[in-house]
C-alpha cells in the first residue's frame, strides 16, 4: 500500500539527484505543479515568466534529443536565460575535470544546472561543488529522476491512479537508469512492478528492489496495466550480451501476440530512443489507442518546467 499523500508546501531537497532522495510529498508536489503546465504548453502563448532573471545551464556529456530539448524548452517557457553548453567544444576535451568545470560555472552564479553524464554519481559530485541547485538528467546507469516523474504523470493522466496497477518493465534492466528510477517511484506510489529481461540483463541485486522478476515475457506481461519497453544500452555493454538483435526481438520484443497476455486496455510506454523491430513492433509503437509514447514526450516538458520552477525557488 502507498503511504497517504499530503500536499507539500515546499520541496525537501535542494537538488534533484534521484527518486530515492524524494519523499512522497515531494513527488506529489512536483506532479501537481507539472499538471498546471499541461494546458499552458498546449496554448498559443506558452511563455510564463516566473523564472525571469534566473540562469539555467545545461551540461550534457552524453547524446540526448528528448531530455535536452525538453529541459531547454522548459526553461525558456518559464522565462529563464538558458545556456546549453556544447561539450564537444568545451575545455573538458582539453583535459579539464568535472570539478574544475563546476568551479568555473559556479563563479558565473547560475541559479540551476542540469547535467547528464556517463558516470554514475557525477551529478552528486557536481552538487557538492556549486552553490546552485543541480538537476540530474541521467547519470550512468544510476538514475534518471525526471523520466520516472514524467512516466508517472503519463500513467496518472490516462489511468487516474498508480496505486494498485501492475506495471511491466521489459528490456535491458542492468544498464538502465530509467528502470531504476521507475522502480523506486512506482514502488513508492503503490504499483506492483514486474521486471522482464534475459538473465544476463537482470541486475544481480534485483531482489532488493521489491519487484517480481521474469525471464519469460508472456508470463511477465500477464494482466499488466502498463507495458514499459526499454532499449538495449549497447554503449554501456563491455561484452556481448546477446547473440543477435533478431533473437532478442523473438523473445523480448513487444509484439501483438505477446501484448495479448497483458490487459486489453494496457498502455505501451517507451522512454526513447526506440529501436523499432528490436524491442518493439512498429505497429504497436504507433498504435493510437494504446501507445502513449508521444504523450510521454509532451508531459516531459511540463514535468521539467515544474522541476525547474520548484528547485529554482
UniProtKB/Swiss-Prot annotation:
Function noted in UniProt: Catalyzes the condensation of carbamoyl phosphate and aspartate to form carbamoyl aspartate and inorganic phosphate, the committed step in the de novo pyrimidine nucleotide biosynthesis pathway.
UniProt-annotated binding residues for L-aspartate: 94, 177, 231
Pfam family, one: OTCace_N
Catalytic reactions of this protein: carbamoyl phosphate + L-aspartate = N-carbamoyl-L-aspartate + phosphate + H(+)
SUPFAM superfamilies given in the database record: Aspartate/ornithine carbamoyltransferase
Keyword Transferase: yes
Key words, A-Z: Pyrimidine biosynthesis, Transferase
Species, as recorded: Pelagibacter ubique (strain HTCC1062)
Key word Transferase present: yes
Superkingdom of origin: Bacteria
Family: Belongs to the aspartate/ornithine carbamoyltransferase superfamily. ATCase family.
Classification via InterPro entries: Asp/Orn_carbamoyltranf_P-bd, Asp/Orn_carbamoylTrfase, Asp/Orn_carbamoylTrfase_sf, Asp_carbamoyltransf, Asp_carbamoyltransf_Asp/Orn-bd
Protein's name in the database: Aspartate carbamoyltransferase catalytic subunit
Subunit-level organization: Heterododecamer (2C3:3R2) of six catalytic PyrB chains organized as two trimers (C3), and six regulatory PyrI chains organized as three dimers (R2).
Pathway of action: Pyrimidine metabolism; UMP biosynthesis via de novo pathway; (S)-dihydroorotate from bicarbonate: step 2/3
Cited HAMAP family: Asp_carb_tr (MF_00001)
GO-annotated cellular components: cytosol
UniProt-listed PANTHER family: ASPARTATE CARBAMOYLTRANSFERASE (PTHR45753:SF6), ORNITHINE CARBAMOYLTRANSFERASE, MITOCHONDRIAL (PTHR45753)
Gene name of the encoded protein: pyrB
Amino acid at each position: 500500500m502507498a503511504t497517504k499523500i499530503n500536499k507539500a508546501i515546499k520541496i525537501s531537497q535542494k537538488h534533484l539527484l534521484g527518486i530515492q532522495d524524494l519523499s512522497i510529498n515531494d513527488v506529489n508536489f512536483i506532479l501537481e505543479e507539472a499538471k498546471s503546465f499541461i494546458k499552458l504548453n498546449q496554448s498559443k502563448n506558452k511563455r510564463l515568466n516566473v523564472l525571469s532573471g534566473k540562469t539555467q545551464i545545461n551540461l550534457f556529456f552524453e547524446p540526448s534529443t528528448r531530455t535536452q530539448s525538453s529541459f531547454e524548452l522548459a526553461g525558456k517557457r518559464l522565462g529563464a536565460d538558458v545556456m546549453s553548453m556544447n561539450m564537444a567544444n568545451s575545455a573538458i576535451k582539453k583535459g579539464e575535470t568535472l570539478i574544475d568545470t563546476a568551479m568555473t560555472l559556479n563563479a558565473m552564479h547560475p541559479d540551476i544546472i542540469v547535467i547528464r553524464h556517463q558516470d554514475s554519481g557525477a551529478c552528486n559530485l557536481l552538487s557538492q561543488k556549486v552553490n546552485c541547485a543541480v538537476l540530474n538528467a541521467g547519470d550512468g546507469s544510476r538514475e534518471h529522476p525526471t523520466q520516472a516523474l514524467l512516466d508517472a504523470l503519463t500513467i496518472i493522466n490516462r489511468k487516474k491512479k498508480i496505486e494498485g496497477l501492475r506495471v511491466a518493465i521489459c528490456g535491458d534492466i542492468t544498464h538502465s537508469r530509467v528502470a531504476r528510477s521507475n522502480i523506486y517511484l512506482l514502488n513508492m506510489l503503490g504499483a506492483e512492478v514486474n521486471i522482464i529481461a534475459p538473465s544476463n540483463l537482470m541486475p544481480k541485486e534485483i531482489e532488493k528492489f521489491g519487484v517480481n522478476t521474469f525471464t519469460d515475457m508472456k508470463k511477465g506481461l500477464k494482466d499488466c496495466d502498463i507495458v514499459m519497453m526499454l532499449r538495449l544500452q549497447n554503449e554501456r555493454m563491455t561484452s556481448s550480451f546477446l547473440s543477435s538483435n533478431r533473437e532478442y526481438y523473438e523473445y523480448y520484443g513487444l509484439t501483438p501476440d505477446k501484448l495479448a497476455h497483458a490487459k486489453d486496455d494496457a498502455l505501451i510506454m517507451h522512454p526513447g530512443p526506440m529501436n523499432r523491430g528490436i524491442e518493439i513492433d512498429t505497429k504497436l509503437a504507433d498504435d493510437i489507442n494504446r501507445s502513449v509514447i508521444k504523450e510521454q514526450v509532451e508531459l516531459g516538458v511540463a514535468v521539467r518546467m515544474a522541476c525547474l520552477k520548484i528547485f529554482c525557488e
